[in-house]
Amino acid sequence: MGSEMCIRDRADAMYSGILVDTDNFVIKAGVRTFEAAAYLRRAGADVTRVRKMFREDMEHCRIRTAIINKAEIYMDEFAISTFDGENVSGATVVGAKAANALLNIQGIRGSFVLTALQDCIYVSARSIDELNVQVIMEKFGGGGHLTMAAAQLKDVSLSDAAEMLKHTLRKMHEDGDI
């Protein structure tokens, strides 16, 4: 019984890792990804149990919704939102989830959520596949990859950081870099 539980727990953990890495089988999910998921299901991974692990509390849901509601559509293709993360546990995670959700808006190529927290602005940048957010975040000293990237800005206000981002997006667009 104990070893079966251990195997099941490990299968759940690995399956949840696949869900996170592929954004629920949306990004970079190939045949081998699905084969691995099927193997883990046969090994005891439970989709319902794993899904319950990813639930968020009501306060985080409300904050994420407020971030989405506050978003500005910039240049008809970028969703940008800001939020003060002080006194919010897991503020950067909530910001990243909001950035993911903003990609569901039709016509949005990239989403950016700027979170102010402890004298730093954390930028979560997301895209589906039409925009390389890594090259944008590299302009701010950050990094990541094609569809998920981030940066941290010091000694700048939330509003100034948003304006810097807009300026960078406009310039890169005009130069044909994005």
Language model feature labels by segment:
Residues 1-7:
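Short, small-residue-biased leader/transition segments that mark boundaries at the very start
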Residues 9-14:
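Active-site histidine-anchored catalytic micro-motif
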Residues 15, 20-178:
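Hydrophobic helix-and-loop "lid/oligomerization" segment in the mid-to-C-terminal part
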